[in-house]
């Protein structure tokens, strides 16, 4: 059962409250624009009330009434004498965070010694990955996190002994990437990292928390393991890798190998699965929708899932996303029309009435099979959900309390933040997926564990059939990596 908090309890304080942080940006610098977007998204989640000053438009501002200041610009010389005055302010008890490495010019070098920099080179450093020297982040210490597409993002430098280094590059050099330094009565925190984005928010939140003796923000403290397309019709016949490793049909593999293994993992790690029902894999998009009469496996798997503490949710009458033609017409700048048709071999729904009828049939099917269950979570097929369909779900199906799609922006997918939307729907995105957890997902999982105290994962039964999702390695290897 999902308990819903009022939407207002998740919102940042109103504009009439005093901002605790001043963020200095420059809208004429690409990195600064990226950082501002990053900071706004982060601060909304950790409930920091901040004021932003664009140094390309105003260079005279009052910084004395804030607890903390964030530098998020490439050219720090825009600050002029104010930069030294801010350092004096820090010395008297303020907090200063350098959000990304500024331009390594003479002006910044004149400030760097106060930030703990002993020596600095002129070249930038390609960070192959990172590791934590301290226990700043849960699950971070003692492991290397690899960056799949590194670039020259960090200053080459060495630090004075009075710096506490939390994060370094994951190589022999161990270049300092995140450190703090007590400066008089205040604190300076430097992110010499230069890689930003949603996947790294938890690291930046942890860095910001170092500015003060104590810092708290609201967290969810929860974990979710979604089984998309489960229960669902089981494919007939066998598959290349199941036949290779087990010599049995896909149906027998699911029943006798895959599902028992998942139950064993659930018992070992205290996992409760959320199974998202697909009634049929028909391509029908016009009502009336024919009920699936072959329910034996639905009853077997669904009952076992519920018996083991799991939940049943809604995925689709079929696996066609709830979208009508033209749903992506307003996707905005950067989106190429036709992307949906190019990437996905799906038909469009004929009308909103047809979409509604398909969900009605799915709910009837699910509640007939599991009378004690009222499904409250909806997962969009292929994580795609049109705005019209979302509005329809909220309006027509009040039993749906949460929508679980994805956290990171895709091509046409429904992207979410962890929040309660204005219409009361709980947005609960999934962060990682599948059995092959790649380096990006490892970083994302670490970040979200520390930002929201959340783990949110989904997989499909047919992952083991799909070479792109690791099937060639075999289920034993996939299970081990999971």
What are these regions (language model features)?
Residues 19-21, 154-222:
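A glycine-centered loop/beta-turn motif at secondary-structure junctions
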Residues 20-26, 90-92, 100-112, 267-386, ...:
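Metal-dependent polysaccharide deacetylase catalytic core of the NodB/CE4 family, i.e.
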Residues 28-105, 256:
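Helical hinge/lid and interdomain linker segments adjacent to catalytic or ligand-binding clefts
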Residues 54-58, 81-84, 173-176, 293-302, ...:
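Alpha-helical scaffolding within the catalytic cores
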Residues 77-143:
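A glycine-rich, often tryptophan-bearing local segment used as a flexible ligand/cofactor-contacting loop or short
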Residues 192-195, 215, 221-234, 266, ...:
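Catalytic grooves of carbohydrate-active enzymes
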Residues 196-198, 214-311:
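Active-site beta->alpha N-cap acidic-glycine motif
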Residues 394-437:
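His/Asp/Glu-enriched short active-site or ligand-binding loop at hydrolase and phosphoryl-transfer sites
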